[in-house]
Each structure stands twice: as C-alpha cells, then as structure tokens.
Amino acid sequence: MSETITLMKSHTSVRRFKEEAIPQEDLNTILSAGQMASSWKNFQSYSVIVVRSQEKKDALYELVPQEAIRQSAAFLLFVGDLNRAEKGARLHTDTFQPQGVEGLLITSVDAALAGQNTLLAAESLGYGGVIIGLVRYKSVELAELFKLPDYTYPVFGIALGVPNQNHDVKPRLPLENVVFEEEYQEQTTEAIEAYDRVQTEYAGARATTTWSQRLAEQFGQPEPSSTRENLEQKNLL
C-alpha cells in the first residue's frame, strides 16, 4: 500500500491540540496543496480565511462553541465564493446570475474538495484537524464577523494544530453499502442496524446515541434558519 493511501486510511478527527503554532512555511505548504484540488471549470469558487488571533477564535467560539476552535493553532474558514466570479463576469456582461442551487453546489463542492486536500496535506506534515460544519448554523453572524461580501457564505471550517490526543480510526460503512455496480441499490434497514452496532461497539462507554439516532436528530428537524437567511442576504438565493 502506498504512503498516500496509508495516510488517507489512517485519518481521524483531532479536537484537542497542543499549544504550538504552525510555522508560516508549513501553513503556506498546506494551503497551496489544498489549492491544487479539482474545481468546476477551474473557477476555484471558494476562499479561505485564516484565523490565528486568539481574540478572533474566542469570538468565533462564542457563536460556535466547539473547543477545537479555541485550541487550534489556526482555524481555516472555507467560504463559498462567487464574489470573484461576479467581478470577472462583469468584465464581459452587464448581468450576473449566481444560478441559485447550481451556484451553491458549484461553490460547496469546490470548497469541500479544497478542504479535504488541505486537511490531508496537514496530516502529511504531522498536524491534525477536524472539519466543523456547524459554522453554517451561524451564517449571518459569521458573515458579519468576517466581513463576508455579497455572493459569499461560510461552508465549513477546519481547526488545525499539533495533536494532543489519539483515537482509533472510526469504522466506515461497508464498501458494498456505498459503492454500487452499474445502478443504485436501495439501502436496507438491516444494513443500517448492522452499522449501528459497529459504531456502538467502536464508541464503547462513550456511546450515547446510535448512528441512526444521530441521523434522526439531524434530519428530523427543519433546516437552520440562519443558513437560508444569509444566502438570501448575500444574493445567492
């Protein structure tokens, strides 16, 4: 097995960090590697805001109370960004249409691909991190905190630092439950219940809910109002 695949298959989320900074050279290497991810038509429809000041991290923590944010050496906010596209398009046309859902998919996928590249690059240098999607639940407040202009929105953040904890690799769904030959295969309740048992065994005494219970918590409630409100304010919907 190649070193790259070994690294990818050993990924764990790291939420506790040592009080050590990430040298600028390492951070530049990590971010430039993230930039090399594939993107739709090479539009690169995302931006990254690097947060290193403790004051700013504390302010973000007040909105999104995840301890990893405060402890991180650097918090990277990945922003879906059509602001740059709007400026580029207006060099050639008087109209700019962000394309609603399609525009959101373009920017979200571009940001996600760059984010995964970024985290993998960080792990290759011995750092750890965790992706924090809860930033979307406070989209309006984050837009103000980070001065996000029209046609931009927070997609997720990555808390990075020198790991101060180690976890076993969390078991994923069996390959046959997510990879199908030629056509989609309907999910079965039995497969979900089997994975519930795998996850519960992995978590041991730390388990408070099953995997399917967390699905119910997420998708048994309406969408976060702040997400849509911010998208509308930024002229993306």
Model-derived regions, located:
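Acidic, surface-exposed loops and disordered segments
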Residues: M1-L237
